[in-house]
C-alpha cells in the first residue's frame, strides 16, 4: 500500500518544500509582533501530547507572574473567526482542546482565544489586551505567517519524525527537515525509566543542531478509582498509552473508541448509555469530557463518569532548564503592545 501512496507523498513533499522555501527566502512574509510569542507544535498529525505540554508551559508563565494568552485554531468548532473563550462556551463553539485548557486556567490571569488566522488572532489579542506579556500559539508549527520568538517542536518517543513518512504514506505534515526551525525539541510520552544512555542515543539519532536542546517528557496520571473493571470512552488520536496505563494498574476496560475530535451523535449517545449500564464507572479523558457534555446525558450516568487527568513532566531533572529559558525570553522581550 505504501508503494501506491509514494507518488502522492512525493507530490506533497514538493508542495511543502516550495512553501517553506518561499518563507525562508522572504518571498512570503513571516509577521513579527511587539510581544513574546511561543509556538508549540509538531511535524506529525495528532497524538504527540501537545495539550498537556502547552498546559505545562502556560503554568510556568502564570506562576512567573506573566499575563498570558493561548491562541488556538479551534479545530472542530462550528464557529468562524476570532473568539475569546468564556465560561459559557461549549466544545462545539470553540473546540475541545481550547475549552479544556481554558477551564484548567480560567480562575487565573489568563486569556484564551481561537482564530484560524493566527496573524489576525494575535493582532486582536494585542488590541483587546494591550498589557499582555506573552502569547502561546497552540499547534502552529506549520503556520509560518507568524514568526515566533521560540519554536518548541514535539515528537512522540515511539513514533519520532525521523522514522516517519510524509502524508499520505505516513503522518508527517512536512518533511523531517522542518525540525531544523525549532529552538527546542521535546520527545514526548517517554518511558519514565528512560536511561541517560538511551537518551543520548536518541539525541544522536535525531541529528539536532548543537544549539538546539532536546528534552524528554513523560506522562503522569492522576489517581484512579478503586475498581477492577470500567468502561472507557475516548476520542483521541492515540489511546494506546492510556490503555497500557490502565492495564498496568489492573483495571480491565471495555473500550469505546472514536476518532480524534469526534463529534458525538445521537447514535453514539445510545451506545454510550448501553455501555454505561454494564459498568459502575465510566472513564474518559479531559478532552472527551468537554464534548460529552453536549450529549446532555442523564444524571445517573453523569455520576458514573470519572475524568482521567494527566500532566506532563520533563525527565532528568531538566524542568528548571527549559522553564528558565522561556521565562528569561519573555522577561527580556515583554513590553506594552500596539498594533496599527
What feature does the model see in each segment?
Residues 278-295:
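Phosphate-bearing ligand-interacting subdomains
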Residues 259, 301-332:
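Short, flexible loop segments at boundaries between secondary-structure elements
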Residues 20-87, 192, 340:
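Walker A (P-loop) phosphate-binding motif
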Residues 11, 51, 101, 138, ...:
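Residue-level signal for inorganic ion chemistry
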